[in-house]
Amino acid sequence: MHRRTALSVSTALLLAAPLLSACSGEARPGTAAVVGGERITTSALQAQVNDVRAAQNRAGQAAAELIASTPNLERQKLDSILQSRIIDEMARTAGLTATQKDIEDERKAYVDENGGAEQFEALLLQKGAMAPGQVDRFLRDRVLLTKLSAKYGNGKLEEPARAAVQALDIEVNPRYGAWDAKQIKLGVGETPWITQRTRPEQAPAGA
């Protein structure tokens, strides 16, 4: 199997330890989360949700199934935003960057190995609830995670991830769920956090 064929959005990365925790306080009006002192607004989160719903609605006969499969889309998209911010902080601390060429090379590899750009985007929508306009962020994360793994070693990102979480001092609006330290997933409750995504499989031939 090629390394990009099974699309892994998330990073076994951070999140293999119940040691990671997040702050949860009183919800600030219009704020989904605060990361490193920067607000993630509910309007920005809703814009991402709307983009995904619009893409799902363009999926023809598959639209209803795609929508039904993402009942907690707000939580899922906030989770994705938080993961990306942590990856950015890890990369910043490590002195690593993702150039536009890096991102385009990553895109080409995924597109080539998944039967073309349309199939690649359809796979991300189906398995990762990502709209076409969100693909670049996915690719950037993949580039940075590859570089982080090269620097620290495969399976050794827990410590830099924990340091990034501490540095960012994340606060999350309780309406979006709770971080379950044992299950390492975002669930219903008071303390939302980052969830590990299911690894999407390659689309069937001819899909």
Where are the model-predicted features located?
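Hydrophobic membrane-targeting alpha-helices
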Residues: 17-22, 90, 147, 151
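N-terminal targeting/tethering segments
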Residues: 25-127
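Short linear loop/turn motifs
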Residues: 103-108, 138-139, 174-181
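Proteostasis/folding factors centered on peptidyl-prolyl cis-trans isomerases
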Residues: 119-150, 154, 192-207
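Acidic/polar surface patches and capping/hinge elements
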Residues: 150-176
